[in-house]
A protein has these predicted regions:
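Hydrophobic h-region of N-terminal signal peptides that target proteins for export
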Residues: 13-23
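Bacterial N-terminal signal peptides that target proteins for export
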Residues: 1-11
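Short sequence/structural segments immediately N-terminal
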Residues: 22-443
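A residue-level detector for conformationally permissive "hinge/kink" positions
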Residues: 9-10, 14, 215
Length: 443
């Protein structure tokens, strides 16, 4: 523990006791005296009126218990673009992965190598054109960038461009050259382990029509069991090893990042993911076999090998079905339309481009992601049903209208033979089923 003069400790205690709420005041005061003199000055001032609750939140954190205060995280070299002088100290309002990495070196290194850290690299993508150009910069700043991250710009004297800050996007590009934001998961200023481990934290970004992992998890047996038995999850434990510290259910953290008896915890969230389900046509990841074996080893803590292997067979079959039946043919048709001069290279300037975008970007992803996480309704009604509906009733007719004959190859494929009609025997079988089940024939 650092040593401070009795006078400083006494004054600090009286100050904090006068401004903090009841039972919290002695704790804040005592914890503050265990920090550096720079952090003590921060705490004394901020408790008087500038963000007092941030100080109280900090007082409940492990940082506070270890004597890690404001200055240790917010200090910044004078040459750093976003640094400014504040009561004689060089600081930044931004705490970046480089800042956290001073103590959490391995975690910061793993994170910088992860897909999360690259989430801000969407310049030139369709998503970026849609957000910045079609919708508009203000929408992109409050929408896309809040998850993907902004390129934070410095106006000078430590002031940050309001068009790019505040921002906690997971792939934020920081003035110090680092990428990402640790606090998007490890919320300020409690830095709570339990918050970071809860699926709701991941659901800040992983939800909605194009990446509904949070909703899929809630539907799955994993999510149902987690919610029912959350009191047994031991979420705030410093050690969190599957089978040792908890066993009743997995969270997002468990499968993608968590420690097991055979695997160390990692901050590279893609280390166990074998498919990239995001693009128009899903593709296997680099080193996908190794990644899959690591994920299987997590599954094996609860499931027999046949169950795990058969699940992956079903999952692969669903992804392959989407690729071969819908997404590859649709992409080929879009290429032919552009080559024939029927559509321009400009995104979103024709109805069929919106149809195609939603086909793979919304419905297609939902089907694939539902399959990956055991969410049957997202595979079926929110997924392949919507894919089929748009493909057959919107996309193919729109393409055929623009370039007659462009869909003929698709219709001849064995995947689409149903379009030629059912046999009399098939129709009769359906009629008999509906008559027996509902006492009425199908329309």
């Amino acid at each position: 523990m650092r040593q401070h003069s009795p006078t400083r400790r006494g004054l600090l205690f009286l100050l904090l006791a006068g401004v903090a709420s009841g039972q919290n005041a002695p704790d804040v005061a005592k914890l503050a005296t265990d920090t550096s003199k720079e952090s003590q000055a921060c705490i004394a001032c901020h408790m008087k009126g500038a963000t007092p609750l941030a100080v109280q939140q900090w007082s409940t954190s492990r940082h506070a218990q270890k004597g890690i205060g404001c200055f240790e995280c917010h200090q910044a070299d004078k040459g750093r673009p976003d640094a400014f002088e504040h009561f004689g100290e060089s600081i930044s309002v931004m705490v970046t992965p480089n800042s956290c990495g001073m103590c959490h070196g391995q975690e910061a290194q793993e994170f910088q190598a992860s897909h999360h850290a690259q989430a801000g690299q969407i310049l030139g993508s369709l998503d970026n054109v849609l957000g910045d150009d079609v919708e508009g910069p203000a929408a992109a700043a409050m929408g896309c960038a809040k998850c993907h991250g902004s390129v934070v710009k410095v106006l000078g004297q430590g002031k940050l461009d309001p068009g790019t800050w505040p921002n906690e996007g997971i792939g934020r590009i920081n003035p110090d050259g680092s990428k990402g934001s640790c606090s998007v998961c490890h919320s300020r200023h409690t830095f709570s382990l339990s918050i970071a481990r809860q699926p709701e934290s991941c659901g800040y970004c992983h939800l909605g029509p194009d990446h509904p992992q949070a909703e899929i998890y809630d539907e799955s047996k994993h999510g149902v069991t987690y919610r029912a038995l959350i009191g047994q999850m031991n979420l705030n434990s410093a050690s969190w090893v599957l089978g040792k510290d908890y066993s009743v259910a997995p969270t997002c953290d468990t499968c993608h990042m968590g420690a097991t008896s055979k695997l160390a915890a990692t901050h590279d969230v893609g280390a166990r993911i074998s498919w990239n389900l995001r693009p128009e046509v899903a593709i296997k990841q680099k080193d996908w076999e190794k990644k899959r074996e690591e994920m299987k080893s997590v599954c094996a803590n609860c499931h027999a090998s046949d169950w795990v292997n058969n699940f992956y067979t079903q999952f692969d079959n669903a992804v392959d079905l989407g690729n071969e039946k819908f997404f590859k043919p649709a992409k080929e048709i879009m290429t032919k339309l552009q080559q024939a001069g029927k559509i321009s290279p400009t995104p979103f300037d024709a109805p069929i481009k919106w149809t195609y975008f939603e086909l793979w970007h919304h419905q297609g992803r939902r089907a694939r992601m539902g399959a990956s996480m055991n969410g049957p309704d997202y595979v079926q009604w929110h997924g392949f049903y919507e894919v089929a509906k748009i493909f057959y009733s919107e996309f193919l007719p729109e393409a055929e209208h623009l370039l007659p004959g462009v869909t003929s190859g698709v219709k001849e494929s064995s995947y689409h033979q149903w379009m030629k009609g059912l046999s009399p025997e098939q129709r009769q079988k359906i009629r008999e089923y509906y008559q027996k089940r509902y006492e009425q024939p199908p329309s």
